[in-house]
Amino acid sequence: QPRPDHSLRVPRPDLTVKIGTPNACNGCHAHKTAQWAADQVAQWYGPQRRQESHYGETFAKARAGQAQAAEALAKLVADAQQPAIVRATALAAMRTDGSTAMSTRIDATRDAEPEVRAAAADSYESAPAAQRLYALAPLLRDPVRAVRIAAARSLSSLQPGQIDAATRPAFDAALAEYVAVQNISLDMPGAHLNLAVVYENT
């Protein structure tokens, strides 16, 4: 089965043992356990092969609701050495309350990677109006359309009077872009739902 991020991964049966992720070894050796595969890899390549920390462990902590997950996710979002899709996913996995989440989100709106900026815009969807507008108004003029429309979508539930006159033209333009993108995909139910939400909000 193809991965959503299109990557080809080095098998890590040790991670299967730790957090239950699939691995290519047991795809063929289905009658064997993940521990057997991890032991074989250690026997062939040495016990230290690919034992470094993996971002999958951070996501596993978050999904299990572990207390230390917030700090681990924040570090992952801030790690520019990680792929943008991983950092954006970490941002989406963070709870939206708490000082760690707040500082991580505002930093992410200024990130060099558009995928991370778009995820930051999405993360503000339920934030208080003033906080949301302060963080997302600059993204309405982002050079990347995906970021602009993510910001417009998150701001669309604000009351008309909550968007100041200086921001209104950029908001209207970005929201029009979002509607145009949905109109391209009207053969898909999701586009109709997205438009319905925006029209209800505005």
Task: For the regions a language model picked out, list residue spans one by one.
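Primarily the internal scaffold of c-type cytochrome electron-transfer domains
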Residues: Q1-A84, A92, P143
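Feature representing long, continuous alpha-helical segments
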Residues: H6, N23-N26, E71, A88, ...
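Amphipathic alpha-helical scaffolding segments comprising HEAT/armadillo-like alpha-solenoid repeats
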Residues: A67-A78, G98-R110, P128-L140, G161-V179
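Short coil turns that connect the paired helices of HEAT/ARM alpha-solenoid repeats
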Residues: A78-P83, T109-E115, L140-A146, I184-L186
